[in-house]
Amino acid sequence: ELDLFKAFERRVKVAEVADACQIDEILLNQWTSVGVSIGHLKSMSRQRYKTGSMWKLPRPKEESSSGVILKEMMELHIPSLLAYPDMMRNKTRNHFDSEKHADTVAQTSRLLEVIALPKIAKLLKGNDKQLVLDIGCGEGGYIKRLAERFPESQFEGIEVSDSVAKTAEKLTASLENVSIEQSDLWDYEPQQKYDLILMNNIIHYISPEKRQELFDRLSEWLSEDGVLSVVTPISGGQDSPPFVAAFNSFFHSFENLHPLPQKEQL
């Protein structure tokens, strides 16, 4: 966000960049140390640093970049886990500001959905004229790709965040087979049945007590042979990698987010 990699495109000292950008020199010095250790920066002679190979750099503005994941981890995951001791002592929880972090979370979801896209596309093959609903469509990158690939099908996306919904509208404005609506899931009233409903990275916003009600509700929105596709992280057991436990702990740290489902629960 500070375009620091651009500031280090030529060999330059930390103090010079700190002065030019009017930022804290001590923190910038620590930032450069991390950059060197992970290969984003090169340490040059006379205490100068230079940006490393461009392909290695996180690029937050590109949906295919790891930069969006790093941004979410720095803004949300790491601070939440570091706050665990205080929360346990005070018996409190953080509050997830959905509007503040909506854009970051939407970008991360869009990056991860690239992995699921081929599987979803298989559900649409063989029947080009389908009606598809994407719940929590984010910035619309997902249904944009599907709409371009299946022009005879109609795609509707609903998104609770007003700013994210507007981004989705802009991204899909050129596609006649896509419509975006700013709406809460529980307030949405479909006008017709859907052949395919997509629900990606939404489960943790729904309390465990209301998940069965949600699935019952969605089943009424499906056509006779309709399909509900759910993409979500799942909570692991004691034998799962440490990252899985840490990831699930993140959701437990917020009063308005909920634990990930177990595979058996799904």
How does the language model describe each region?
Residues D225-P233:
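Conserved beta-strand signature within the Rossmann-like core of class I S-adenosyl-L-methionine
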Residues S161:
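Conserved SAM/SAH-binding beta-strand->alpha-helix loop
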Residues E139-P151:
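Conserved SAM-binding loop of SAM-dependent methyltransferases across substrates and taxa
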Residues D128-G138:
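Conserved class I S-adenosyl-L-methionine
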Residues P241-Q262:
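Conserved Class I S-adenosyl-L-methionine
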Residues Q212-E224:
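A short glycine-rich, Lys/Arg-flanked "PGG" loop and its adjoining helix->strand segment in the class I
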Residues E1-H77:
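N-terminal accessory segments
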Residues A168-E169:
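Conserved SAM-binding loop
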